[in-house]
């Protein structure tokens, strides 16, 4: 089964909610970019470069400085396996910009846990087809010839893929999407020196939504070995088929 065949939509809604359905009435969520927002120096990037453990800061304090949307407590356990994606319809009052988003799990006891993240420079928002194939829902070439201008006040369709994960979110927990325009300790964003305002469309025919690769609990998983994923004879990579 293709990952797109099992993507579940959660729509960004007024009141900082993530809802399984969207309203026919359009609304807007406004956010002024805070360039001091950060995931801290011990982020996924430090893990890649220096093999350090990921240690995020107080996610609730960070969320207070961002645009956030959260589900109601989940009625059932939900397994997310694959790459989540975010489809935003937005405008900015600047001629450049970026978005940095995190997906978090809010436990029933109030604790918040980091699940994954994604980021995109608006100029690279053109969605392309990967020449060598891509298992995820969204792919950008990041090549010069695919750059798109950013016009202040003009609506943009900004789709980005978050890093793939496999996790089980328990019934009673919630999911929170946190949207920022910067990550001070990890990213150099194009808007440093200015404070643009982002306006994200909620509802209507251009509704912004989070797409989650949710696994059907009634289907037994199958997998195949990915040939040549790693050198040597002792390392294997597997691709889940459903």
Kindly label every feature range from the protein language model:
Residues 4-242:
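C-terminal, loop-rich substrate-recognition/catalytic regions characterized by aromatic stacking residues
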